[in-house]
Amino acid sequence: MKITMIGAGYVGLVSGVCFADFGHDVVCVDKDEGKISALKKGQIPIFEPGLDHLVASNVASGRLNFTDDLKTAVAASDVVFIAVGTPSRRGDGHADLSYVYAAAREIAANLQGFTVVVTKSTVPVGTGDEVERIIRETNPAADVTVVSNPEFLREGAAIEDFKRPDRIVIGVDGSDGRAREVMTEVYRPLYLNQSPLVFTTRRTSELIKYAGNAFLAMKITFINEIADLCEKVGANVQDVARGIGLDGRIGSKFLHAGPGYGGSCFPKDTLALVKTAQDHDTPVRLVETTVAVNDNRKRAMGRKVIAAAGGDIRGSKIAVLGLTFKPNTDDMRDSPAIAVVQALQDAGARVTGYDPEGMENARKLIEGLDCARDPYEAAAEADALVIITEWNEFRALDFDRLKSTMKTPLLVDLRNIYRKDEVAKHGFRYASIGRPD
């Protein structure tokens, strides 16, 4: 099938290249001429394991192309996916849908023959209705069906998630079966591998995405609050998480205590769901609390580091390892590291950071951050070493080397990737999350 992907950002690029790898002819469209030029040269604007190889192989096969010419791409398409950004609207937390609606107008003006227009971006309930209204207002003669098909990709594992999904949710309204047939064909390689296609209404599909992300965010926030309680009563949050996670009704995923959730999805999607519910006079109190607790969590982690370092860090050097919101990505959006570093700086410390992939973005987002080339350069003459993001390369640190270069051998482990006895034998003081120290 001929597919156009509007938006060559994270979701659009990963989805487009995976569709091409399925054998479809895919054109990724973006208004950013610099981005398109770079992609044509094989320069990938984001870090995602395996993405560069997959782009190169599908470009070489002729199945994947990049352009800023939306008109030509849309006119030749069977399916057009809208995968543009939906950031939180400045000031009120609602999702900013201006890019989605602008894309809908441009798509409408260039449709030729029957076309399925799909919202792949995460959008509030009812957005598909407005996209359809815009298309029909712009081009009353258009033979089009608007479909919702939310993405469920985890940054750092997006290709695996796309090719081996737990489910594929497709929201289709009306009695015209053509869109259902088209979407089944688009996902045929996965359907043949028995990945379940969940067909539902458009509005239900849109809500599934928000409800799923909100539930996972609540699960993270729950275990973080349990971790705080563990510290007060002398319990171990990792054992608590294992003990409840083995219950099949609960499951073990997203029960890892830490500095709070961040990234491009959970913060904005929980906030957007809260606003949608308030607009319909049906507040979601659990999600409201999740948002508030998580915001405070990030700042509290800064205070935890300060307390571990003796309560006064004025003039101290603090080294932080891991700046992205999670491992295996260069995404700094709403990363807990931002709030932690700012809290340390506000308390008078000089902060030096290292991240395997996030340094370029960190420089843009964290003013006054000193940047190191590796963990040991970051730790030189440091009064404390803080692990914020659990990159694999931080799981086997040379503590003897660290001790020889640090001013004070103190490790504050905000991801619980070490045990106290492991680091104490090297002469380090150790603080972690939700465990007896």
From Swiss-Prot:
What reaction gets catalysed by this protein? UDP-alpha-D-glucose + 2 NAD(+) + H2O = UDP-alpha-D-glucuronate + 2 NADH + 3 H(+)
Q: Does the keyword Oxidoreductase apply?
A: yes
- GO molecular function (one): NAD binding
Q: Where does substrate bind?
A: 151-155, 209, 213, 254-258, 262, 326
Q: What InterPro entries has UniProt attached to this entry?
A: 6-PGluconate_DH-like_C_sf (IPR008927), NAD(P)-bd_dom_sf (IPR036291), UDP-Glc/GDP-Man (IPR017476), UDP-Glc/GDP-Man_DH_C (IPR014027), UDP-Glc/GDP-Man_DH_C_sf (IPR036220), UDP-Glc/GDP-Man_DH_dimer (IPR014026), UDP-Glc/GDP-Man_DH_N (IPR001732), UDPglc_DH_bac (IPR028357)
Write the record's keywords in alphabetical order, separated by commas.
Capsule biogenesis/degradation, NAD, Oxidoreductase
This enzyme's EC code(s)? 1.1.1.22
One GO term of the biological process aspect = UDP-glucuronate biosynthetic process
Q: Which residues bind NAD(+)?
A: 11, 30, 35, 86, 122, 155, 268, 333
Q: Which SUPFAM superfamilies match?
A: 6-phosphogluconate dehydrogenase C-terminal domain-like, NAD(P)-binding Rossmann-fold domains, UDP-glucose/GDP-mannose dehydrogenase C-terminal domain
Pathway entry? Nucleotide-sugar biosynthesis; UDP-alpha-D-glucuronate biosynthesis; UDP-alpha-D-glucuronate from UDP-alpha-D-glucose: step 1/1; Capsule biogenesis; capsule polysaccharide biosynthesis
Where's the active site on this chain?
Answer: 265 (nucleophile)
NCBIfam families given in the database record? NDP-sugDHase
In which family does this protein belong, per the annotation?
A: Belongs to the UDP-glucose/GDP-mannose dehydrogenase family.
What name does the UniProt record give this protein?
Answer: UDP-glucose 6-dehydrogenase
